[in-house]
Amino acid sequence: MSNLIADWRDRPTHRRVWALAAPMILSNISVPLVALVDSTVIGHLPHAHQLGAVAVGASLYTFLAWAMGFLRMGSTGFAAQAAGRGDGAALRQILLQGLLLAMGLAIALGALGIPLSGVALHFMQPSAELDQLTREFFHTRLFGLPAALASYALVGWFLGTQNARAPLAILLSTNLVNIALNLWFVLGLEWGVVGAARASVIAEWTGALIGLLMTRKALRAYSGHIAWAALALWQSWRPLLAVNRDIFIRSLLLQSVFFLITVQGARLGDATVAANALLLNGLLLTAHALDGLAHAVEALCGHAIGARDRDALRRSLVVACGWSLLASLGFAVLFLFAGHLFIEMQTDIQNVRDTAFVYLPYLAALPLIAVWSYLLDGLFIGATRAREMRNGMLLTVILLLPFAWALQGLGNHGLWITFLLFMVLRSATLGTIAWVLRNNDGWFAGRVH
C-alpha cells in the first residue's frame, strides 16, 4: 500500500500522463461528438427509420473499420519501444509499413463490404425503409475507408513517439469538418441520411492528409533512414504482422459483440434500435474519454518496457488507474442524474425517447464496469502482448455465449445485461493474465523488438 501511495504522489508521472492524456481526451471526445451530431441532426427528422438507418449503417461501417484497429494499436506498441531505444530507422519503417497495410486492407474491405452488408441486413430483418436507407448510407461511407485506416496507422505511430498533439490535430480536424458538413448537408441542403455519410467521407480524407503532412516534422527528432531493401524481406514484416494478426482477431471478436447488439436490437423494432443507438453514444463518449488515459498508458508503458524501467512502468499504471477511476465515477453520476437530458438532446421522437429512458440505469453502470478493460488494453498494447489480448477476448466471448443465450427471453433488458456481463468478463480475463505476467516478470522477458 505504501508503494501505491508513493507512486500516486510522484508529480513527474502525473505530468507525463496528462501531457499525453489531455490532448487525447480532447481529440477522442470529438469522435463520439460526431455520432452525437449525426444522431441529433437525423434524430430531428420525422421518422424513426431514418435514425435507425444511421445507427445500423454506422454499425456496419464501424464493424469493418474498427476491426482494423490493430493498425493503430500495433503501430503504437512498436513505435513506443523503438522510441524508448532511440531507433529512428525502426520508427520510419513502422510508419511506412502501417500505411502500406492500411491501403491494402482498405482495398480488400471495400470489395468485400457491399456483399457482407447484404448478408448482415438479411439476418437483421429490418423494415423495407430501414433496409434501403441503411444500404445508401453504408455504401457512401465506404469511400472514406482508405483515409480512415491510414489515420489509424498515423495516430498509433504518433502516440508511440509520445506526440499527442498530432493525433489531436488529425482527430479534431476530422470531426470538426464532419460536424460542420453534417449540419450543412443534412439541414441546409436537405440530403438526409446520405448527406451525413458524405460529410463523414470528406472529413476522413481531410484528417488523413493533415496527418501525412505532420509526419515530416515529427521524424526530424529521430535520426535514421528507411532500409528500403528490408521492406521486401518477410523478416522485417513478421513481428508487425504477427502482432497485428492477434489484435485483428481480438478486435473482430470485440466488434462482433457490438454488432450483434445492433442486430438483436433491430429485431426488437425500429424504436428499440434507435434508442440503443442513443444510449451507446453515451458509452462512446465515456470510452473515448477514458481511452485518452489508456493511450497514455500505451505510450508510457511501451517506452518503459523498451527502456527496461520497471519503476516507470509501475508508476505510470498507478497514476493512470487512479485518474481513470475518478473519471469513470464522474460519468456514472452524470448519466444517472442527467441521462434524460442526454437522450432528449439527441431526438424529439417520443417513442424513441420513452424506450431509451427505460434503459438509462444500464448506461450509468457501464463506466464503472468498463474502465478496467480500457486500462488493461493500454498496458497490453504498449507491451505488444497481442497474443494475450487475443486469448483473453476469445475466452471472454466463449464464457459469454451461454449467458447471452439464456437471457434472450428478457428482450432488450437481456441484451443490456449481457453487455454489462461482457465488460465484466473482459476485465476479469485480462486482469488474470496481467497478474500472471507480473508474477513471472513477463512484461520484460524477451520483449525487445
What are these model-derived regions, one by one?
Residues 1-21, 79-146, 177-180, 186-245, ...:
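Short alpha-helical transmembrane segments in multi-pass integral membrane proteins
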Residues 36, 45-48, 82-85, 160-161, ...:
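Helix-loop interface residues and adjacent transmembrane-helix termini in multi-pass membrane transporters
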Residues 36-40, 111, 119, 153-157, ...:
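Alpha-helical transmembrane segments of multipass membrane proteins
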Residues 39, 48-51, 88, 164, ...:
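Membrane-helix interface/capping residues of multi-pass secondary transporters
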Residues 53-111, 148-162, 166-167, 275-337, ...:
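Small-residue-rich hydrophobic transmembrane alpha-helices
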Residues 171-178, 281-282, 361, 394-403:
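Small-residue-enriched core segments of transmembrane alpha-helices in multipass membrane transport
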Residues 363-374, 378-404:
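A late C-terminal transmembrane helix in Major Facilitator Superfamily
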